């Protein structure tokens, strides 16, 4: 009797840690990007955050809006996605405040803020 090859089976499970996995500033985005995202194009910057656990995105929006003149463009409390809008310096400062507060006060692992 010939031996059949076996297939290894792997089960993967998503276990989120406390982390900010993306913090990005888009300075002076094109009007098409605003249109595709459903945002008003009267601002000069978009900030993007991805956070786990996703409920912390609510805290991030609270920190960001209290830090200065930014508005919440999008918040998904189920995926942890946050989009902020405002002028470049306000959005940059908001991203810094969010990553600093989550990192220092709540012991999240944070990433560097990137910019395009």
UniProtKB/Swiss-Prot annotation:
<comment type="subunit">
    <text>Homohexamer with a central pore lined by a beta-barrel. Hexamers pack into a loose array. Interacts with PduV, probably via the beta-barrel which is predicted by modeling to be on the exterior of the BMC.</text>
</comment>
<keyword id="KW-0813">Transport</keyword>
<dbReference type="InterPro" id="IPR044870">
    <property type="entry name" value="BMC_CP"/>
</dbReference>
<feature type="domain" description="BMC circularly permuted">
    <location>
        <begin position="9"/>
        <end position="108"/>
    </location>
</feature>
<protein>
    <recommendedName>
        <fullName>Bacterial microcompartment shell protein PduU</fullName>
    </recommendedName>
</protein>
<dbReference type="Pfam" id="PF00936">
    <property type="entry name" value="BMC"/>
</dbReference>
<keyword id="KW-1283">Bacterial microcompartment</keyword>
<dbReference type="InterPro" id="IPR000249">
    <property type="entry name" value="BMC_dom"/>
</dbReference>
<dbReference type="GO" id="GO:0051144">
    <property type="term" value="P:propanediol catabolic process"/>
</dbReference>
<comment type="similarity">
    <text>Belongs to the EutS/PduU family.</text>
</comment>
<dbReference type="InterPro" id="IPR009307">
    <property type="entry name" value="EutS/PduU/CutR"/>
</dbReference>
<comment type="function">
    <text>A minor shell protein of the bacterial microcompartment (BMC) dedicated to 1,2-propanediol (1,2-PD) degradation. The isolated BMC shell component protein ratio for J:A:B':B:K:T:U is approximately 15:10:7:6:1:1:2. Not required for structural integrity of BMCs nor to mitigate propionaldehyde toxicity, may selectively transport specific metabolites. Proteins such as this one with circularly permuted BMC domains may play a key role in conferring heterogeneity and flexibility in this BMC.</text>
</comment>
<comment type="function">
    <text>The 1,2-PD-specific bacterial microcompartment (BMC) concentrates low levels of 1,2-PD catabolic enzymes, concentrates volatile reaction intermediates thus enhancing pathway flux and keeps the level of toxic, mutagenic propionaldehyde low.</text>
</comment>
<dbReference type="GO" id="GO:0031472">
    <property type="term" value="C:propanediol degradation polyhedral organelle"/>
</dbReference>
<comment type="pathway">
    <text>Polyol metabolism; 1,2-propanediol degradation.</text>
</comment>
<dbReference type="InterPro" id="IPR037233">
    <property type="entry name" value="CcmK-like_sf"/>
</dbReference>
């Amino acid at each position: 009797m010939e031996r059949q090859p076996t297939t290894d089976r792997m089960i993967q499970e998503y276990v989120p840690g406390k982390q900010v996995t993306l913090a990005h500033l888009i300075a002076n985005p094109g009007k098409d990007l605003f249109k595709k995202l459903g945002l008003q194009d009267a601002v000069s910057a978009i900030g993007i955050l991805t956070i786990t656990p996703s409920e912390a995105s609510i805290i991030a929006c609270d920190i960001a809006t209290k830090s200065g003149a930014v508005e919440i463009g999008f918040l998904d409390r189920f995926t942890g996605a946050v989009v902020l809008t405002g002028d470049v310096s306000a959005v940059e400062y908001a991203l810094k405040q969010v990553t600093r507060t989550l990192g220092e006060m709540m012991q999240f692992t944070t990433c560097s803020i990137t910019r395009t």
